[in-house]
A protein has these predicted regions:
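Extended, helix-rich architectural segments
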Residues: 1-134
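Structured, contiguous alpha/beta core segments that scaffold functional sites
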Residues: 72-73, 79-208
Length: 208
């Protein structure tokens, strides 16, 4: 119920949660009312386009999942990629912060099929004499994504079996990172946050 209420406040279904407008101090001169009306109309169309894109995508479902992780576990990681938003639960990533709580490094872990990766990988040698590579879990490999703040920019790449995956290096400005490390209640000096459920942990234990 709490996740649903937070979802409605963050992404209301029939209302835009943001507004595009021009700051008067950035224009440099007064513009006529006709031009301002045309600008407002164009911005309104852009707002509707964004809302239609969100409605057609899977972003609402992913954000709702992240909210539930925040309420219970206090932590979630979102990646805003070209194909939509991806949620990483706490058991799929680690984060390193400085003393002020600023994120410095992120490492994520995923299981991805060898066929999806699209380049040759060494086949692991089984410890037994039985061929375990046919149709088993060995078809999936652990892919790690390493994200680091370097010289004022976020840089990241992906690795598998200690090899960097080709064409996975990317970067973004510090102020426009697609990696969002979320916490419900931030605790000073700690790497991870606390969830809403933890506030009632004593009451929950007494119910047992």
């Amino acid at each position: 119920a709490l996740a649903a209420k937070l979802m409605l406040s963050i992404l209301p279904p029939q209302t835009s949660f943001f507004k595009l407008q021009v700051r008067d101090d950035k224009l440099g001169e007064e513009i006529p009312p006709e031009a301002r009306s045309e600008l407002d109309l164009s911005f309104s169309k852009m707002e509707r386009m964004v809302m239609d894109y969100i409605a057609a995508s899977n972003d609402r479902v992913v954000i709702h999942q992240a909210l539930k992780h925040l309420i219970v576990g206090g932590n979630a990681l979102l990646f805003m990629g070209k194909d939509g938003i991806k949620n990483y639960p706490l058991n799929r990533y680690v984060v390193n912060r400085d003393g002020n709580g600023n994120v410095l490094e992120i490492v994520t872990k995923e299981l991805i099929s060898r066929d999806v990766l699209g380049f040759d990988l060494p086949v692991p040698t089984p410890n037994t004499g039985i061929d375990e590579t046919q149709g088993g879990a060995t078809d999936d490999v652990e892919v790690y994504t390493y994200v680091k703040l370097d010289n004022g920019r976020w840089v990241w790449h992906q690795e598998v079996l200690d090899k960097i995956i080709p064409e996975t290096r990317s970067s973004a400005p510090k102020s426009a990172s697609p990696w969002l490390v979320l916490t419900f209640n931030e605790v000073d000096g700690e790497q991870y946050g606390r969830g809403r459920v933890e506030e009632f942990l004593g009451d929950l234990k007494s119910l047992e």
